[in-house]
Amino acid sequence: MAKQPSDVNSECDREGGQLQPAERPPQLRPGAPTSLQTESQGNPDGEGDRCPHGSPQGPLAPPASPGPFATRSPLFIFVRRSSLLSRSSSGYFSFDTDRSPAPMSCDKSTQTPSPPCQAFNHYLSAMASIRQSQEEPEDLRPEIRIAQELRRIGDEFNETYTRRAFANDYREAEDHPQMVILQLLRFIFRLVWRRH
């Protein structure tokens, strides 16, 4: 049975201007429906391997009516140029037909999820696992609250201690670096003494 000219044109448009031979399996992404593989097989009747470029639609025009399986495929978004514009047989655009865009969700019972759908599902599961790991069990919550309170008390003590050191007298603040130097010298002296 010979193919209709519109089928040849749509296959030409999908394959970039050339039909694939029947011996070679088509190059489809993993997980594509098998119905697409049988639809995009080569030309079994031996008609020419080139598309008719003299057609009114031209070699790069969108197909007039895609097959029933092409609209379900995630690759259909690359075949169709606009969901609002359609070409009639004369090659002019018309707004008469109502074409709704293909649904973006994946049907879990008939096909594997598309890569964007897989990435989104992975993101959701990763966010859920992060939330679960951030929630502490009931046993650790009192200890964490006590640790936070101790840290707050320590921060307040450090803040008040540094204020007192600089507020009392500037001489004491000036003597402070000398004490640090004396302690450093004492530490060095102990290291040297232990080595001998």
Swiss-Prot record:
Keywords: Apoptosis, Membrane, Mitochondrion, Phosphoprotein, Ubl conjugation. InterPro entries: Apoptosis_Bim_N, Bcl-2-like_11, Bcl-x_interacting_BH3_dom, Immune_Signaling-Apoptosis_Reg. A motif (BH3) lies at residues 146-160. The modification Phosphoserine is found at S65, S73, S83, S90. The BH3 motif is required for the interaction with Bcl-2 proteins and cytotoxicity. Induces apoptosis and anoikis. Forms heterodimers with a number of antiapoptotic Bcl-2 proteins, including MCL1, BCL2, BCL2L1 isoform Bcl-X(L), BCL2A1/BFL-1, and BCL2L2/BCLW. Does not heterodimerize with proapoptotic proteins such as BAD, BOK or BAK. Identified in a complex containing BCL2L11, DYNLL1 and BCL2L1 isoform Bcl-X(L); BH3 integrity is required for BCL2L1-binding. Interacts with YWHAZ. When phosphorylated, interacts with TRIM2; this interaction is associated with ubiquitination and degradation. Interacts (via BH3) with MCL1; this interaction may sequester BCL2L11 and prevent its pro-apoptotic activity. This is Bcl-2-like protein 11. The lineage of its organism: Eukaryota, Metazoa, Chordata, Craniata, Vertebrata.
